[in-house]
């Protein structure tokens, strides 16, 4: 079994590149790893590094062809993608630009030199956004508009032959140069090959987390969970903050964690606690009595977190907490100037789970060292306000630039500010379509993270979105597996596919959510005149459907949309297949609802396993394949088992064909399969009961003029806006007559403006002009 230090190095032979990749001089070694990636080492002593570092765990890339041109003093390497030149054995120093080593992307003017400031780098994420009020100073990312990025591994810790992390010689340079031009997906692939692919998180981590920093009594925890259950609002993780122990007595609980864990587990909830190893263990405390058997001092701290303290930390304290039922540790070591010790804490805590055949899971700020290997990144104790909410989507997208998808934000904001119902609801909706859903705040009864503390209308909306989150977990978990295997992030910035809008602030927060969703989060207050948010959204290329309302949008253009409190700008592409839970308490669903969107062919692979162990690596998983073939008024849907073992023996399906009507014929490939079909509003449902796993299903549906028009949906939306707006009924009737007339849009605009003479205020005229634009585009 691997130990807690070196668990992340799966095969030490992969630390060495293939022999044809090396070009070696007296003081330099260049390793051509891929067509986009080269390693550059410089050492005055001619000593080069083959051991793992805190960042790098694999240097064995597939062999590639490249070309070398060499003289006594110069070397030129052409990979086909870029050309690197180097003055042999010349020093590679930090500081000013130098042309002794440089690289050019072939066929372009994009040139890198040592110490290039990389001003067009789009940055990654920083340590945290604790208390940030506006702008964020971000760390460097991999993605640059110049198409190159330098990763400096010179100061990383090295894992020595005794499995100890040690510092490196300060007189060396160890650089990884990515020259990818426009192929950022290829850059990420190389980065993950080098540093390890993203970790697979437990399934329960995709549910809702509860973290309110109250001084809870055992009975208060039970009452809180009972209330969540009573209101049909699910949670999966209960995280205790500062008060589960006396902070002067760091690791001895002041409440009965075993009882709490047993109760939470009976409700399918995991227990987590917050720890901060910087707290000193002082003479006279219970913890000191344990430590004093090994170390003699009147006080003791685990920071700096050294190799010789690891055993004491885990064997005396962490193991004890785990025996009481603690599943998750939130590492609250908040010191941006000491990321090395934070990384060590992350590395060892995560590794302790892995060597026990469990999936690691921690909550931690960003150490900056391969954070994708140590989920989940905690953005910190953020402020409660609209400015913070507006920062969060973009922060998630910055994570994509360094390969990180799992970022947890305190939903609702953590501290300060004003508790506003509209703000809280928009936080919750954003969380529903984020990788991690963490309800968190400082302690105190006036921080209203409990949904029932809000008005009945807001609570109803919160309940809807929290339950929707759980319904989407089959989709989210499959996307998590895809991220783990391929490195394709769960959230992807919109500007990757549309670089022309990268500097357009209106669209900066838009993102893809998995392969089939597109989200344009609401981060501003609504227009009180119409009681709706007026939001401009740029829809991607293709055909998309509003996930909640069903309206169809033609892509590659912008729309001025209108959103009530209960609405949210989430879109699903044509041909998408979205698997959903019907019973949110089931880990492996016995019944699935599958949403199928028209106007394009589609496919989806549903991934499932036990949700917590690493047995999936040994084949204990199941992949179900869904296929959809679309022709006008003729639809074929197939279900087949693609791979893995049977985790359930049978499964029932409720297959919801979206926006379909006027069906004339339904056939299924096997007459022995029992099925039923019916309409539900604008959807057509086919139900199949107890289908044997491994048994293929094929459904064919035929109809006439079967696609539901978006016009009727838009018309109803306009009528609702007219109902809500605060003007005279007579003016409403006149506006209705104009909007729903057969005259062209230009004449409608003129007619609306003329209503000013009859008392229609300019602010309303502007709104209805926007509505006309919306109608025209739809």
Give the role of each language-model region.
Residues 568-572, 695-703:
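Generic detector of short, aliphatic-rich beta-strand segments that form the cores of beta-sheets
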Residues 467-486, 540-624:
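Catalytic cores of secreted or luminal carbohydrate-active enzymes
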Residues 27, 36, 44, 81, ...:
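A broadly conserved detector of short glycine/acidic/proline-rich loop/turn motifs that flank catalytic sites
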